[in-house]
Structures are given as structure tokens and as C-alpha cells.
Design a protein with these regions (language model features):
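Intrinsically disordered, low-complexity terminal tails/loops enriched in metal-binding residues
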Residues: 19-169
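N-terminal signal peptide c-region/cleavage motif recognized by signal peptidases
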Residues: 14-16
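Sec-dependent signal peptide recognition
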Residues: 2-10
């Protein structure tokens, strides 16, 4: 009986490890698919670019940059995409993130409803672009933060899911 109990105990300890490993493999595969769809929808290669998402007290920032400052094709593709999404987001159209992530990201419903209380401003930066998102509406702000936290997690950027106290632009 003790031998059986010992074996059962060892198996019980092993189950969470197998479960965690399976979860990691699933997440890695999911991020690979997100990047593949992103390359297609956004028009630039995620292997040649860096994506960042920042939460700000009044909204947030979506930023993409070419890794190589001489990669003019990636820089121009990023800029084209960011001009496009700032215009679409301003109209309440979040179909691109839905296509990339294969689901509607959290916060999108509220951001669509409150689109007139949110600004999406495109800025070119040295190696790419950013979209600055701002609002004074507390419900819109929560939705923006939910949206950006989802982006951080689903893209696996490693960006902080906490609000940065620095307000730029």
C-alpha cells in the first residue's frame, strides 16, 4: 500500500509540471500564429521589428520600430500601417486587431462606443511610428488599458502592464 501511495504522490506532483509545459507550448504556438497573422495584416515582418505598448495615466501608446535603422522597407511599412490604424481606430474600427489576434480584444466594445471621447494621434519616430491614445473619460481609459494589457500579453512584448507616470505628447 505504501508503494502505491508513493507512486500516486509522485504522479500528483508531476501533473502540474506537465500541465504547465503544455500551457507554455500552447502559448508559444499561439504567439507564432499572432505574429504570422500580424505580418499579413500589418504588412511588416515581426522578425525585423519591435512592437511596444505603454499604459499612460490618460491613455497609452502603441509603438513599432525597425530593428535595423537602415531597413527603409520596414520603417515605411510601419508608418503606413500606423497612419491606417490611427484613422480606423478613430472611426471605431478595430477589425485589424481582431484579425491579428483571431478574437476581439478586451476593451474594444467600450472603445467603439466611446470613440468620440478618445483621440488616436499618429507620430513618426526615427525607426517607425507610434499612435498616442488619449481620453478624459474614465470608462474609455479602463477600456484602453484593458486593450493595451491584452496586446502586451498576446504579443509577448514583455512591456509593463502597469501605468507609466510619464506623460509625453
Amino acid at each position: 500500500m505504501t508503494k502505491i501511495a508513493s507512486i500516486l504522490f509522485i504522479l500528483l506532483l508531476a501533473v502540474p509540471a506537465f500541465s504547465e509545459e503544455a500551457s507554455c507550448l500552447h502559448h508559444t504556438e499561439h504567439q507564432k500564429k499572432v505574429n504570422e497573422r500580424g505580418d499579413r495584416v500589418m504588412g511588416f515582418d515581426h522578425e525585423k521589428t519591435i512592437h511596444h505598448f505603454e499604459l499612460k495615466p490618460d491613455g497609452g501608446v502603441i509603438r513599432a520600430e525597425a530593428i535595423d535603422r537602415n531597413d527603409v522597407n520596414s520603417i515605411e511599412s510601419i508608418r503606413h500601417h500606423f497612419v491606417e490604424i490611427s484613422g480606423l481606430f478613430s472611426k471605431g474600427d478595430f477589425s485589424m486587431p481582431a484579425m491579428i489576434h483571431d478574437r476581439i480584444p478586451p476593451g474594444v466594445g467600450v472603445m467603439k462606443t466611446l470613440k468620440d471621447e478618445i483621440t488616436f494621434t499618429h507620430h513618426e519616430i526615427e525607426k517607425g511610428s507610434e499612435v498616442r491614445i488619449k481620453t478624459a473619460n474614465p470608462d474609455a481609459l479602463k477600456a484602453i488599458h484593458d486593450f493595451l494589457r491584452f496586446q502586451i500579453e498576446d504579443h509577448g512584448t514583455g512591456d509593463s502592464p502597469t501605468i507609466s507616470s510619464l506623460i509625453l505628447r
